[in-house]
Every structure is written in C-alpha cells, then in structure tokens.
Amino acid sequence: MAYPANWIVSGGIVLSFAEYEDFLDTDKRVFEANEGLTETLIEDSATKATNRILAKIRTTAWWQTIFMRLASQNQITQTQTLSTPYVPLPSANNIQERQADFTDLCVYLTLYDYVYPMIADFNNVDSAEVQKIAVFRTKYNELFQELIDDGSWYDFSGDGTITDLERMPTRTNLVRVR
C-alpha cells in the first residue's frame, strides 16, 4: 500500500496521519512561542488523535452499515456480541483516497484537543489560544462530517483499489434543536 510521505508508519502499520512538519505548516507561530512543544510531544499527540479519529469513525452509521454490508460472515461472527455485532475499528492502512484530508483532520484534532489546551489561558476567554481551540474544533467537525458523507475513501477489502461496492456516500440531515 502506498502511504503519504507525511504519515507516520511503523512495520507497515499507520500510526499517525500527520507528522511534525504538518503542524508547522498549519500554525508555526505557536511552536516558535512555546519551546516545550517538541517534535516528540506533537507526534505522540498526533498518534493519539489518529486513534481517536478511527474510534469516532467506528461509531458512525456509515461505518456500521459498510461493515455489515461488506464483511464476510466469518468477520461478522468473530465480532458478534450477545445482542449486536461489535463493529471493529477501521484500519488506517485501508484509507486510499482523500489522504490529505485525513492529515488535516489529525492536525485539527491534535491542535484543539492536545496542543492548545496545554498553553491556553482559560481565565481569559479572549486569548488567542482559547479562540483557536474553537476554530480548530469547528474545522475538525466540518471536515469529519464531509469525509463521512463522502464515504468513498476506504478500501474495505484491502486490495489496494476502491470498488463501486466499497463507495458508500451518505447524507446527514442536521437537525436544529431549540
């Protein structure tokens, strides 16, 4: 499988959708002003963010539907629980399209959930870091929903090509609650 050069891969397993340079490209000033934000710290946080992204994908109706539709009976039986099938995490190795969007998704989640909370002054709601948390959270949520709605980036069979059966766009109806 071909992975983007900026994904962190070890032993053929994707660990992170982003590397340190991706964060510098997104918001270099935060790293210049905060010397404690080391490459190791950021890439470890990006690995955690990648795992959280995959866990969130697992909870979507899109992933549950595609798994139940395309999984073999053996795969379904192996993941069966007492009442419903347990849907496993999608494999980061099988993401074949929109890989740059997954890099952006990882960067946004890492910045708003790990990096900025370390340096933000939450006593001052007008601080730039607190506002950037909100900006990156919004970008993350919008891009995540766009990827799920697109539904055409995952190679379920792992054979290196995405077939028409594996492409499953969805439509999410957002409901306003008053």
Model-derived features with residue positions:
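Short helix-capping/linker segments at secondary-structure and domain boundaries
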Residues: 115-126
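Amphipathic alpha-helical coiled-coil segments
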Residues: 143-154
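Short secondary-structure subsegments characteristic of cysteine-rich extracellular domains
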Residues: 124-145
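Extended, hydrophobic/aromatic-rich amphipathic alpha-helical segments that build helical scaffolds
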Residues: 103-116
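Conserved short "hinge" loops at termini or chain/domain junctions
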Residues: 1-100, 155, 159-178
